[in-house]
Regions:
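Signature for the C-terminal beta-barrel architecture of outer-membrane proteins
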Residues: 1-160
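C-terminal structural cap/anchor segments
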Residues: 147-186
Length: 186
């Protein structure tokens, strides 16, 4: 897609005892990036919507209007990347241990946690005064759920009731096929 527009926002809140009387602290936040607008090199897709109304749709993670592709009308307008970040830490004078979870999303289903526990789970031990080991980090990446079984949008909803989902196919997008790349590099 040529002449792509980008949107980014992030907000983090840290809860911490500034007098160091209480050892627990926490961080909660959100990061959100979106590619939108531009003109696809695929003639079947063509020019993507990019009005002020479409910008508001992108900022809010809403589905596209009537001038968007069918997939963007069903899901969200544009190509979205983001995460909800959670961290809990326990601090002592000579060490700190923390656990964190980054719940990533690429579309509406991930934004509303339909992709369940997909994300990055981690733990960290900080030893600032230890002579030869300062930090130990353990992380576990889960991508198995991808919002459930694959879409059944084309099926008869009377015969197959429920909400379609699945097939998130992380970091791939039907309209923005090169993703977040510059000169075909990530």
């Amino acid at each position: 897609v040529d002449n792509v527009l980008w949107h980014h926002k992030s907000l983090f809140v840290q809860i911490k005892d500034t007098r160091n009387d209480f050892p627990l602290s926490g961080v909660i936040g959100v990061q959100h990036w979106a590619q939108w607008g531009g003109t696809s090199t695929n003639p079947k897709i063509g020019k993507q919507p990019q009005s002020i109304k479409d910008l508001i749709r992108v900022i809010c993670g809403s589905e596209g209007g009537g001038d968007a592709t069918v997939s963007d009308q069903i899901n969200v307008l544009g190509n979205h990347y983001g995460s909800y970040d959670f961290k809990l830490a326990f601090t002592q004078p000579n060490w700190q241990v923390s656990a964190y979870y980054q719940h990533f999303f690429e579309d509406k289903s991930g934004m509303i946690f339909v992709n369940n526990t997909d994300g990055l789970w981690g733990g960290q031990l900080d030893l600032p005064k230890f002579p030869w080991l300062r930090k130990v980090v353990v992380e576990y990446l889960v991508t198995r759920d991808q919002s459930g079984q694959f879409h059944f949008i084309d099926f008869d909803h009377d015969l197959h009731p429920g909400v379609g989902g699945g097939g998130d196919d992380y970091y791939n997008n039907g309209e923005y096929t090169t993703g977040a790349s510059y000169f075909n590099r990530a």
